[in-house]
Amino acid sequence: MVGPLLVPASGVGELVPLAGGTPVGVVVVARPGTPAADVSAALDATHGTALDVRGVEIGWQADWRSLPFADRPPVLEIPRGADRDRALADVRDGQQEGHAVQAKLRTGATPTWEWPDEHELARHITDVVQLGISTKLTGGLHHVVRGDHDGGPQHGLLDVLVAVDAAITDALAPDTDRLAEILAERDPAVLAAAVRTWDADRTDRVRRTLTAYGCCGVTDPITELAELDLVAGAA
């Protein structure tokens, strides 16, 4: 259930000696606006070490195909504003060209990024499904159910999964308002009951669309999923 370790480009140098000789799968992450040279330097620092780079996460830019590390599976953070639709369409084009590229939306607030409410997240999910692309979500998914935590609102992992399933099911007649209602649901019993109806095929199609989520402490959502008897208990 836990994928590669997400490492900021600025922190690769600190991780190398800690890894020792034990292979560690990592994804190098850089915030939008980080110079490509800094990302390249971080990747260069992993050469000959135990760090196995599985991909890079950067802000979307029109020339991402020409970046020196574009051969690494890239995850492109989608901006707000005028470039949003262009960026999502570009990810679709990249996937159709054979690139292992995905979109990313930041679901948690930062000093420079206002928290995306359920309507904004619903629009992202709708557009991703309509374009037929894969996405990951990062930041803010510390709990399985929508709620107020640490002084502010946070989206829930189960809410997101159920919303993605609904978007796929209703792909011929997309209803962003309905997805927003799902994303605002705060009753874990309602969400858990919905997920329990999924068979393997339905689960796989959700996972093909929502490939991953980034979280500071993965034990929180996993523990909460176990408490709802949706996964085996985590040690």
Question: Which residues are covered by each model-predicted region?
Answer:
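Expand to "…catalyze enediolate/carbanion chemistry for C-C bond making/breaking, isomerization
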Residues: 1-235
